[in-house]
C-alpha cells in the first residue's frame, strides 16, 4: 500500500480531487496533509484524508522570538525547550486523524 504525503492541505485536497476524478479508492490511498486548515480538517472528518498536521503557530512564534532574543544577546539557545543544538529549536506538532479531528474543528 502506498501513502501520499504532501507539503500542505491544499496539495492534499488536490490529490483527493484527482483520485476521485480517476475513480481511485481513497480507502486504499492514505493521503496526508499539513496545516490543519478548515478544508483539510473537513477532508479528514469525511475520511478523504488520513490525517493532517497541526502546527501550533503560537508555539512556533514564541520559540522563534525566544531564540532571536538570545541570539541578539549572543547567548546560547541550547537550553530552550525543544532545542536540539545551537541551530534548531523544535516545536511539537500534532497529528489530526479521524479519532481526534473534532478537537480541532
Set out the residue ranges of the language-model regions.
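Hinge/cleft segment of the Venus flytrap/periplasmic-binding protein
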Residues: 62-105
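Residues at the C-termini of beta-strands that transition into short coil/loop
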Residues: 35, 56, 99
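Short, hydrophobic secondary-structure boundary micro-motifs
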Residues: 3, 28, 52, 79-81, ...
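Hydrophobic alpha-helical
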Residues: 1-42
Amino acid at each position: 500500500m502506498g501513502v501520499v504525503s504532501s507539503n500542505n492541505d491544499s496539495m492534499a485536497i488536490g490529490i483527493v480531487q484527482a483520485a476521485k476524478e480517476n475513480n481511485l479508492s481513497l480507502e486504499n490511498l492514505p493521503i496526508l496533509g499539513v496545516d490543519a486548515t478548515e478544508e483539510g480538517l473537513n477532508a479528514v472528518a469525511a475520511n478523504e484524508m488520513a490525517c493532517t498536521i497541526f502546527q501550533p503557530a503560537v508555539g512556533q512564534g514564541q520559540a522563534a522570538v525566544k531564540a532571536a532574543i538570545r541570539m541578539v544577546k549572543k547567548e546560547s539557545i541550547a537550553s530552550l525547550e525543544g532545542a536540539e543544538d545551537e541551530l534548531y529549536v523544535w516545536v511539537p506538532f500534532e497529528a489530526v486523524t479521524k479519532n481526534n479531528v473534532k478537537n480541532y474543528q
